[in-house]
C-alpha cells in the first residue's frame, strides 16, 4: 500500500486542484499520471446545472463515441423471428427469449449490454430485480428498447455509452483509454458533451455545463477549461 500512496501523492503534486487546464494540457497530465500496468480508461465527470432531486431534471441518454471506447462489448438481445436473425447478423453475442431469461435468472450474466425488442418486454420486465441493480435493464431512453435491434447492436459494438446523472448532479462516463490519441479522446468528449446539451431539461436554468474534469482509472481528476474545448 505504501507504494500506491506514494504514487498517488506524487500524482497529486503535479496538479493544481483548483486550476482549470486547457484540454490538451489536461489530457497530458492525466496520461502522465496514469502509471498502472494496464491500459487505464480515461473518464470524464461533468457537473450539470440541474436539481437532480427533481424528476423532470433527470438527465439520461446514450451516445455513440466516434472513436469507440477501446473496450470489447458483449451484447445480449431479447428478440424472436426476423429480429432475432437481424440481431445475430449485426454481431449480437447472445440472442433469445425465455431461454435467455432463464440464463439471467440462473446468474449467467456474461454480457455488458442488454437490448430488447418492445414485444419482448413481457419477459424482460420480470428480470428487473436482476438486471436493474447492475445497470443492464433495457430502457427506451437510452435506445436499448427498440424495434431496430440490429442497429442497437451495431451502436453498442461501435462504442455507445450510456449516461445518467447521479444524485449530486454529475454525469460520469468513459471516453476512451490511455492508449488513445488525444484527437480521439477529444472527439469522444465533444460527442458526449453534445449529447448532454441535447438532453438538457427544459426546466434547467442558468449555466448548464458547470464543470468538467478528466481522470484515469487510478489517477486524480484534472479540471478542464471549457473555452479550450471549442478552440
Curated annotation (Swiss-Prot):
Keyword annotations: Repressor, Ribonucleoprotein, Ribosomal protein, RNA-binding, rRNA-binding, Translation regulation, tRNA-binding
Coiled coil regions, renumbered to chain: none
Q: Where is the signal peptide?
A: none
Tell me which InterPro entries the record gives. Ribosom_uL1_bac-type, Ribosomal_uL1, Ribosomal_uL1-like, Ribosomal_uL1/biogenesis, Ribosomal_uL1_3-a/b-sand, Ribosomal_uL1_CS
An annotated GO cellular component: cytosolic large ribosomal subunit
Name the PROSITE patterns for this protein: RIBOSOMAL_L1
Q: Does the keyword rRNA-binding apply?
A: yes
Q: Per UniProt, what is one Pfam family of this protein?
A: Ribosomal_L1
Q: Which GO terms are recorded in the biological process aspect for this UniProt protein?
A: regulation of translation; translation
Q: Which GO terms describe its molecular function?
A: rRNA binding; structural constituent of ribosome; tRNA binding
General function of this protein:
Binds directly to 23S rRNA. The L1 stalk is quite mobile in the ribosome, and is involved in E site tRNA release. Protein L1 is also a translational repressor protein, it controls the translation of the L11 operon by binding to its mRNA.
Assembly information from the UniProt record:
Part of the 50S ribosomal subunit.
What's this protein's family per the entry? Belongs to the universal ribosomal protein uL1 family.
Looking up HAMAP family in the UniProt record yields: Ribosomal_uL1_B
- Protein name (database record): Large ribosomal subunit protein uL1
Species this protein is from: Cupriavidus pinatubonensis (strain JMP 134 / LMG 1197)
Gene name in the database record: rplA
Amino acid at each position: 500500500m505504501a507504494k500506491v500512496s506514494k504514487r498517488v501523492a506524487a500524482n497529486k503534486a503535479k496538479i493544481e486542484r483548483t486550476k482549470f487546464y486547457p484540454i490538451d494540457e489536461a489530457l497530458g497530465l492525466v496520461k502522465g499520471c496514469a502509471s498502472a500496468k494496464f491500459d487505464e480508461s480515461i473518464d470524464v465527470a461533468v457537473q450539470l446545472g440541474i436539481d437532480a432531486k427533481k424528476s423532470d431534471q433527470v438527465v439520461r441518454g446514450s451516445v455513440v463515441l466516434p472513436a469507440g471506447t477501446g473496450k470489447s462489448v458483449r451484447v445480449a438481445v431479447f428478440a424472436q423471428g426476423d429480429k432475432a436473425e437481424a440481431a445475430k447478423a449485426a454481431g449480437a453475442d447472445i440472442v433469445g427469449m425465455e431461454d435467455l431469461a432463464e440464463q439471467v435468472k440462473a446468474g449467467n450474466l456474461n454480457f455488458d449490454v442488454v437490448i430488447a425488442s418492445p414485444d419482448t418486454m413481457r419477459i424482460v420486465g420480470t428480470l428487473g430485480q436482476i438486471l436493474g441493480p447492475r445497470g443492464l435493464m433495457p430502457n427506451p431512453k437510452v435506445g436499448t428498447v427498440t424495434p431496430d435491434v440490429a442497429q442497437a447492436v451495431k451502436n453498442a459494438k461501435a462504442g455507445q455509452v450510456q449516461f445518467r446523472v447521479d444524485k449530486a448532479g454529475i454525469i460520469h462516463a468513459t471516453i476512451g483509454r490511455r492508449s488513445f490519441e488525444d484527437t480521439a479522446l477529444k472527439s469522444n468528449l465533444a460527442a458526449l458533451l453534445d449529447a448532454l446539451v441535447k438532453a438538457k431539461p427544459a426546466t434547467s436554468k442558468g449555466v448548464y455545463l458547470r464543470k468538467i474534469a478528466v481522470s484515469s482509472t487510478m489517477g486524480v481528476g484534472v479540471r478542464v477549461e471549457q473555452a479550450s474545448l471549442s478552440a
